[in-house]
């Protein structure tokens, strides 16, 4: 099944729940990443049944700062390696954190899907080298405050 068909069916299901007062609408938006013969796709669904395709998107509490980061950087994504894309995702996630919360391997996970690869989740210890890398980059730029937690602290 093509990703666009899956998202259309899911959005239709969400929308049907808004048509009757006896059915409770879904109260959640989803980000759905797919890869098919036409390439990679990222869809966002809304509880109302609306859906959109994006090149990059963030949803949830405080997601506007993440979207701002993604809008500023998305033109470089096509030329990025998988490792660079993972670091961009973590930087976007870190941008949405409140001042007293830090990004660490216990509170973050990254989902990866692509051509010739099935969906996989990177979390816990395998995620730590990516977090360390973005912290080093942020230190070099002087922007490391509140970016990620130091695992040795």
Question: Language model features by range: what are they?
Answer:
Residues 1-153:
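Long, low-complexity N-terminal extensions
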